[in-house]
Amino acid sequence: MLNYIAMYPNQYEGLMNPDIILGKQDTPIEDFIIMAMKELEAIDNIKIENIEIVRDQDEVDINRHMINVNYKKKNIDEIEIPKYKYIADSRYGEIIFTIRVTTNLNEKVITKRILYPIEYNGFYYNNGKRMKAIWQLVDGSTYAQRGKNTLKSRMPIIIYQNRKRIITDINDMKYIVTSYSYALNGKSKKPGAKAKVKFINPVMIYSAKMGYHNTIEFFGMQDIVSIETKVKKDEDLYYYFPLNDMYIKVLKDKFEKYDLVRAFVCMTYNLNSADFPVTPKNIDDRDYWTCRIGTVGTAKNKNLSTFREKGITTIFMIERLLDATTIQNLRLPMYYKSNIYYLIYWMMISFDELRTKSNIDMANKRIRKNEYIVNSSLGKKINENINRLIEKRGKSRLNSMDTLLELFNFGSDIIVSGMRNLNDLIKTDDIVNDNDFILDLAYSSKGPNSLGDGNNKKIATKYRYLHPSMAGILDLNTSSNSDIGLSGSFTPFAKLYDGYYFTPDHEPCQGRYRFEKDLADEGFRKIHGNNFDEYLKYLEKHDKFKELLKYEAIKIVEKET
């Protein structure tokens, strides 16, 4: 009888999901490293000319990664490489980047090597230790908090909604409408202090890129909202709201029917400024709006132009928010994630749908492994270095080749060293038998970009609770001894979609289409396409704003002596 048990049909055998056990669909770690390094090409002075991947560990000279290379030195080739033979068993590959750094006065070609761990039978051998990387359970895209939605990216992208903003028309009638604000996290002046948040009017951001009238069209408000210098005799059809010495003119029926129209009018109304009024001359002046952005959260000054550099730096910071990894993972049409400006617009028009998401529903979660190994160390360091360069850019004495070369002054073993600090996610192997199958299914909600930002006391109790969506995905019999509900094990039957999501449903993104379709049904405007897919193809093909919303060039120009 025992000889035939293996032949007995098992009804659950076909339900086993090898992808979650073996992780074969995970993006290779080399791809994440290349994506992280390519972020440096956001700076016009830097161009990666060649990439060589060395997967054979016998061809990797570990001694090259045991020294700190200062790229500001003139003769890097003269640095002496030690010749040691290490006893510790480690399995590493390396990626060799050939990078050309140029300025208006100088040029230099450097070689940057990045050491990375090679997985062998599900384990890493790092500095003589056998390590196992487990899954990290993170938010799939956005998560909702009181009055705001946050998209997890390189840095959080935060949109606030205020449903009780009061605006007053020229007849002193008050309206309670919805408005949106973009929140940019600033630096705290004191170590450990809470960072200050800048609340910026989104219409101001778009106007700084392409002027106000192009912003009207980008939001789909053409023929609905306009700016007038005087009130016309058509108040039976239009509402008029003051905008300094001008007026916001909006169709009454559309204002009363559509929340998108009311929100746009409110954001425009909030552009009023007693110190730096909006005029017909400056309403489409990008430089004016850039300076206005620079005034947010700063001390008052009667000279608007003094805020220009601050405004440019803020725009650079906004354009640094969205990284290639987020674009790859986000389940949206490319139109809405092609750059940060389209993404902020999507977050506003889809705010209510995103707000209804449950933060503990597994449908709003995904898992990752190679991503956090790279981005928690290399990705984070590159981001910090670029932000530091942006802040230095306005100081002419720091605009030099040395400032650019400082971007590369980090250890080539930054990834393998960083792995040793990810104790919640990368476990040192202490299994005394060959039953390591359970480790392949282990997960943790802790780690980089996780709940509580590394402080478990900040995590609300509700995030430790069970949710109906966890049935069939999480092993309800397994949990952490010290942090209940924050780590455990998946079942081998959990289904995965689009890589590592738990639902086939993509992000809601039809808010603008529904708005345009309603206008078409009223006979007010023609819609292009018979369905959402056709409408989206038309937008992508006839996108006049793509060039207007392209990122500003980050460029270092050396001062001639």
Regions found by a protein language model. Name each.
Residues N106-K112, S450-D475:
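Flexible, glycine/threonine-enriched loop-and-boundary segments that flank and lead into catalytic domains
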Residues D453, I484-S487, L496:
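Surface-exposed, glycine-biased beta-strand/turn segments
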Residues M1-N435, Y443, L466, T491-A494, ...:
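N-terminal non-catalytic structural scaffold regions of very large proteins
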Residues I431-A460:
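Active-site-proximal "nucleotidyltransferase
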